[in-house]
Amino acid sequence: MSCIFCKIVKGDIPCVKLAETALSLAFLDIAPTSKGHALVIPKEHAAKMHELSDESCADILPLVKKVTKAIGPENYNVLQNNGRIAHQFVDHVHFHIIPKPNEEYGLGVGWPSYPISPEEIKALGEEISSKIK
């Protein structure tokens, strides 16, 4: 097993644990972008969010909420990346809780606008909603 997060779940690699459920684990990031930067991971290994079981999905977000409240930031980002070009560097689903105390620390995000017409948005919405089961 080469997944660093699976090794943390097993206890093979230490972490500064913040909280744990039967299905999820929260701990401090060892290379934080701000004070209190934490990770919440499912104990189940899944590389991308859409591969995660419904049980793990249902378990993890309440833990993200509890950890965020405990960290106590007024401003923060909750980030979950899937795939290399989306900036995922560990192939195990994980949520970053990143406090944003000021302009210097925390996550800086650019948000480029995608050119799409209202008609294209409507057609895309219909296409996507038809695939949701």
Swiss-Prot record:
The enzyme's E.C. designation: 3.-.-.-
Top EC class, one word: hydrolase
Locus of motif Histidine triad motif: 92-96
A molecular function GO annotation: nucleotide binding
Compartment(s) where it occurs, according to its Swiss-Prot or TrEMBL record: Nucleus
Catalytic residues (UniProt): 94 (tele-amp-histidine intermediate)
Entry protein name: Adenosine 5'-monophosphoramidase hnt1
UniProt subunit comment: Homodimer.
Domain HIT, residue spans: 4-107
Reactions this protein catalyses: adenosine 5'-phosphoramidate + H2O = AMP + NH4(+)
Species, as recorded: Schizosaccharomyces pombe (strain 972 / ATCC 24843) (Fission yeast)
GO biological process, one term: nucleotide metabolic process
Entry keyword set: Hydrolase, Magnesium, Nucleotide-binding, Nucleus
PROSITE patterns: HIT_1, HIT_2
Protein's job: Hydrolyzes adenosine 5'-monophosphoramidate substrates such as AMP-morpholidate, AMP-N-alanine methyl ester, AMP-alpha-acetyl lysine methyl ester and AMP-NH2.
Protein family (similarity comment): Belongs to the HINT family.
